[in-house]
Structures are given as C-alpha cells and as structure tokens.
C-alpha cells in the first residue's frame, strides 16, 4: 500500500525497489533498490516488498518475502540498517522498538536506530500469527493467531502477559483505535470485533 510522506508518495514494487513519487506531478523523485533477487531458480529468486511501508520519524521500514527488513532514511534515501528477518505482515512500533512478526510466527523487538534485536518470542511459531499492533500507552503489543487467540506481550521483554479467545476463527488483521489499548479485530469469518485492554 502506498504511503504519503509530506509531498511524496512512497511505494514498494515487486522488483524489490522503493520509490518516492511526487504527489503533484507524478514524477519519480527517487528510487532505492531494497531487495535483490538471489538463488539458482525462479522460486528462490522471488523478492517483493510485501508489508506496507512503516514510517517512524525520519525512517521508513520495509519488509519483504524471502528477504529482510530494511530501515531507510527518508531525507537521504540511504539504508540505515538491515535485519535478516523475512515477513509479509504489517510492522508496528512502540517508542523506539520496531515490532515484527516473522513468516514462521516468531515475534521480534528491534531497536529502530541500530537494527539490533532486543528480544525474540518463539512461543507462537507456526500458528499463523498476525502482524503486531503496538499499544504505546501500555507499553504492550497484541497479535492474533490462526486459532483465534489474541495474545498480549510486553514490549520491553517480549514476554506473553495476557491471552483471550475470539469466537470467529483465525485473526486476519488488528486495527488500532487509540494508543491506550482500544482496537478492532478482523476474523476469517468476516466478523469485526472491538476490544480494550483493561
């Protein structure tokens, strides 16, 4: 999904490039190769910017299938750091912690400035875990899985601190309503439910 930053639309392409398009003229202002194909066959060489670009301060974070997470400076269009985590899910953050659900279901807390992994939670591996939603006011994050579980984790440690069950099957997406723990959950059966962390 394209994202607007000031007067530029930033969009990722299947080629693995991230471009900045002038909002008024439609001309490309800049283009940066984020992911490069590798491997000996067409499947192994698949790269794509799959998650929505995520903006935090002067950085834009991009993630892709069979690739990595890249932090790019918006002002200079230079790469700040890369982390070898593959994901197609949306990213989140709380303060200076980037929140990532890897393709295998592991959840990572990554320092937004350095790219250093602060913690890893492996207890939800292979459970079809959703992208994380950060809840800044509570210093927590929430994810869902294919069985309809909502799981709350501590942003500082990655420790699981709460769990609840949805009646509607697998969690597809979690949408923020506020920074204080109110959110919507879309389930695979089409149900949309409102939640609040107490």
Regions found by a protein language model. Name each.
Residues 1-6, 31-55, 78-95, 118-136, ...:
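Extracytoplasmic beta-rich repeat domains
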Residues 19, 70, 108-109, 151, ...:
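WD40 beta-propeller blade core
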């Amino acid at each position: 999904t394209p994202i607007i930053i000031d007067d530029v639309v930033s969009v990722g392409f299947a080629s693995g490039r991230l471009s900045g398009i002038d909002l008024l003229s439609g001309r490309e202002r800049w283009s940066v190769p984020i992911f490069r194909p590798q491997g000996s066959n067409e499947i192994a060489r698949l790269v794509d910017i799959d998650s929505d670009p995520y903006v935090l301060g002067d950085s834009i974070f991009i993630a892709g299938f069979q690739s990595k997470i890249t932090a790019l400076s918006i002002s200079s269009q230079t790469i700040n750091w890369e982390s070898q985590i593959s994901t197609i899910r949306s990213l989140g953050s709380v303060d200076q912690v980037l929140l990532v659900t890897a393709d295998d279901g592991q959840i990572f807390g990554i320092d937004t400035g350095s790219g250093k992994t602060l913690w890893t939670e492996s207890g939800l591996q292979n459970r079809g875990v959703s992208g994380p939603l950060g809840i800044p006011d509570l210093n927590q994050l929430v994810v869902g899985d294919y069985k309809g579980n909502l799981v709350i984790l501590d942003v500082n440690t990655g420790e699981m601190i709460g769990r609840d069950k949805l009646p509607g099957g697998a969690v597809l997406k979690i949408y923020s309503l506020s920074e204080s723990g109110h959110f919507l959950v879309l389930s695979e059966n089409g149900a949309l439910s409102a939640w609040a962390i107490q």
